[in-house]
Amino acid sequence: MSLNFLEFEKPIAELEAKIEALRDVSRHGGDSAIDLDKEIEQLEKKSLELKKKIFSDLGAWETAQLARHPLRPYTLDYVQHVFEEFDELAGDRAFADDKAIVGGIARLEGRPVMIIGHQKGRETKEKVRRNFGMPKPEGYRKALRLMEMAERFNMPIITFIDTAGAYPGVGAEERGQSEAIAKNLKVMSGLKVPVICNVVGEGGSGGALAIGVGDYVNMLQYSTYSVISPEGCASILWRDSDKAPQAAEAMGLTAPRLKELELIDEIIEEPLGGAHRDHVKMAENMKATLLRQLEDLEQLDEESLRERRYQRLMNYGYC
């Protein structure tokens, strides 16, 4: 599988191409393969050191590129690797089933939970079917329906956020995009069950926030969370989308910066090179975090849970 190396990863890509070429020779080169083992080992060490060096000092723009990586695990990947017995639930019971939002009931180590998340799609057909992970009002109303169901059956809610933003089309606006988002914010803030939100890729504006109000808000190490994309910000402030790297730095959209501002609770570590390099390892890190946080929240009664969430929301903007 091609890893789709990003621009800043070119030195790593060149090294790994050399390693793969040597492995190919080793596999088909007969007796000469013995002489290549040491060289392959040296190149692998060099590649590891280079990865550590590059990924220890990523800027906001490089992080934004990683957050959008096409091979990054999406909601259904986490469903596959973290949960058991997933049953997808569809439709908002009012207009349509928006494929940009997926949700359903599953088990986490035997514990029933409700899962809701954005789903982007990888191949062209799937991307179009999922509307590139940009939900319409019916998507957010589906999410709301599942949240209310979870509350009725006393199931914790776990959300996975990965969207460039809510879909800005005319039809979406006519069907009440802003109302759907606003209602989700209102309802989520008062739910009587634990809610854990995870930004796993792009956290784009209200489209992300509509499933992002919770008792814990986590971000993956190389995810982003912001009111607008770096390109959009650059176009507004400098009339030049090419200034996106400068905009990304100014926006403070990375997990460490948002943790510093106390807008998120925890940063979930990614495998070296990003979550796309090892879906299973990333899922293990996610699962460990969810289990620990759920255990913490399950110690609270309904009133304490809601009060804790209310205080958390009221403290936004104070550092």
Curated annotation (Swiss-Prot):
Alphabetized GO MF terms: acetyl-CoA carboxylase activity; ATP binding; carboxyl- or carbamoyltransferase activity
GO biological processes: fatty acid biosynthetic process; malonyl-CoA biosynthetic process
Record's catalysed reaction(s): N(6)-carboxybiotinyl-L-lysyl-[protein] + acetyl-CoA = N(6)-biotinyl-L-lysyl-[protein] + malonyl-CoA
Pfam families the UniProt entry points to: ACCA
Source organism, top-level taxon: Bacteria
Domain CoA carboxyltransferase C-terminal: 35-296
Assembly and binders: Acetyl-CoA carboxylase is a heterohexamer composed of biotin carboxyl carrier protein (AccB), biotin carboxylase (AccC) and two subunits each of ACCase subunit alpha (AccA) and ACCase subunit beta (AccD).
Protein name according to UniProt: Acetyl-coenzyme A carboxylase carboxyl transferase subunit alpha
